[in-house]
Structures are given as structure tokens and as C-alpha cells.
Amino acid sequence: MSEKFTLSLEPRSVLGKKVKRLRRSGILPATVYGKGIEPIAVQIDARSFQAIYRQAGRTSLIELHIAGHPPLAAFIHALQRHPVTRDIIHADFRAVDLRQEVEVAVPLHIEGKSPLVESGEAVLNQVLSTIEIRALPTAIPAHITVDISALDSFDKSIHARDLMLPPGVTLVTPGEELVVGLAHTRAAEGEEEEAAAETPAEPELVRERRESKEEEEE
């Protein structure tokens, strides 16, 4: 289970284009929504949010305390970023019922060493960086481990169905989805091309003589 965090939010009365003034003063506008509750406009100190986001990411439960509302269990669901600076300019919190399963995207962490990658013959080709799972909010893992130590030949790969999931967690991503595989390095491809080039070609004169002999026998 992921670590639980607590965050205090203030109700926000500034809406629309006026939120630019909040951002200039170091305040991040946000919205809390979820099944069975009306969306709540809130605000938080931008630095405090950044600190929580670095630790919690999008898979750890956060207990939200908002004046005038009961505590809410939520995830950081979506972020809006400035198109140039990439600073976070708005956050969405998704409140959840701890008794009901939810579907979320969980990051994949690569562990282990592939013998072919270590020898320089191959490079790792990671196709998916997250997978979709379904679980109770309290059972959602911070990440799913992908062990690549068994990738010792180019015909081996890891698909979503091969991942080891914790108890109570169900895979939502299609099982046949490729997670990670191996690709030849340029150096290895170059060696194969050199080997092919070194194979002596049959002299033209020998081929002509062989073809003439076959015609005579016919």
C-alpha cells in the first residue's frame, strides 16, 4: 500500500481569468471532484503542493482537509502546465470512496539486468511506462516492478500479463500489450553486416562454367 499524505486546502472564491493573480502570489488553483460530491474550487500554496506531489505522485492517497467539508480521501488526478515554462498552473484532485475499487495508471519500475544489455549486444526497448490497474484505493501500489533479468535472448519479451501484481490488484491494460523487449545495438548490427561482407562471393567465371556444364548435361 502506498504511503498516506495529508494536505490542507482553502476554499477558492477567485475563478476564471482572475486566477492569474493567485498564481503571481504563489497560490495554485485546484479543483476537487468525485462521485457523489459537487466540484469544490480550492487553492493551496504552490510550494506545498510541489512538495506533496514529489512524494505522493498520482498513486498515493492524500487526505484532504477543506474548511466546511469533511475530510476527503483523494488522488492527484490531473495537472495543467504552462506551455512554455512547464510550471504547474492547476491541479485536479479525485476524491474516492475507500470501499469501492478504482481504476488508475501505475508507473512501471525496471529492475534487474538483462545479460544481452550488459554485454552491449542489445538495448532495452520499453514500450509502456505505466499500466492501468483496478483495486481498492488503499491497495494501490506506488509502482509495479518489471524484472528484466530473464531477457537473455532476442526472442524474449515481457507483456502486461507477465507482470507480478500485488494481492487485490487486477490488470486492466490488455494482457497482450508489450511492456519491454530487446533491440539490437548499432554495433551488433554493424558486426553482422561485416561478417556478411567477409563471406566470399562465388567468382563469376566459376558460375558461368557451372551453368554451361548443366546445359550440356541437359
UniProtKB/Swiss-Prot annotation:
Q: Which GO terms describe its molecular function?
A: 5S rRNA binding; structural constituent of ribosome
Keyword RNA-binding in record? yes
* Bias-annotated ranges (Basic and acidic residues): 204-218
Q: InterPro entries from the entry?
A: Rbsml_bL25/Gln-tRNA_synth_N (IPR020056), Ribosomal_bL25/Gln-tRNA_synth (IPR011035), Ribosomal_bL25_b-dom (IPR020057), Ribosomal_bL25_C (IPR037121), Ribosomal_bL25_long (IPR001021), Ribosomal_L25_dom (IPR029751), Ribosomal_uL5_bac-type (IPR020930)
Its GO CC terms are: cytosolic large ribosomal subunit
Q: Does the keyword field hold Transport?
A: no
The UniProt keywords, alphabetically, are: Ribonucleoprotein, Ribosomal protein, RNA-binding, rRNA-binding
| Coiled-coil residue spans | none
Origin superkingdom: Bacteria
Which processes are annotated in GO (biological process)?
translation
Q: Where is this region: Disordered?
A: 185-218
How the protein assembles, per its UniProt entry? Part of the 50S ribosomal subunit; part of the 5S rRNA/L5/L18/L25 subcomplex. Contacts the 5S rRNA. Binds to the 5S rRNA independently of L5 and L18.
What does the UniProt record say this protein does?
Answer: This is one of the proteins that binds to the 5S RNA in the ribosome where it forms part of the central protuberance.
Family affiliation = Belongs to the bacterial ribosomal protein bL25 family. CTC subfamily.
Q: Give the protein's recorded name.
A: Large ribosomal subunit protein bL25
